[in-house]
């Protein structure tokens, strides 16, 4: 939601609350549907506490789904048809990760079967959502868009989302290996994946410095990168016991 709001600020447009409501509810729905589609046959026999806890409180998933459907239905009546079509496209791209629509090595499944695709798929979906959705609604409402700024912003957003997502993959290396899910982190190993995080921080910061953004926004985004770098270096990758500190990236 915050990233979608930032898109409006970068383009110096008034924030559309209905787009933010769609962003929030659609994200919650996709996460919850992802959980349901990946539900093991016997969740309580899982080796992972997170899986056992989630499905021992499955009623919370359904409550959230019902609430989000209601709020989403309210919001979609306040945006243009072109925006709804684009939202449906983003939703289709998102669920393609879990839905068994393809075959790979003789097995039917979704994009999650392809080695290393998870990280890039998440970053793509979030970029399409937090950058593309506000812009599509602005275009449908008759606003002129600076396409150089749009593509530059989309590229930076994709890099930033890679940076924010990779530490979660590093945290989940053991669990993903247990489920035979070949993420970029499992393919590279923890040390090389951690190094890649630092490289993305520096690349993203360098591109920010020459970005066609207002100076105050540029300074704020560079400071956010500095905070991310400190979190990665001093807390997230350093602490092996409390690896749930990776969730601090959400606040950064």
Residue ranges and their predicted role:
Residues 15-19, 61-104, 198-243:
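Transmembrane helix-loop-helix
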Residues 23-45, 160-184:
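Acidic (Asp/Glu-rich) catalytic motifs at the cytosolic membrane interface
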Residues 152-156, 184-200:
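A loop-to-helix transmembrane entry motif
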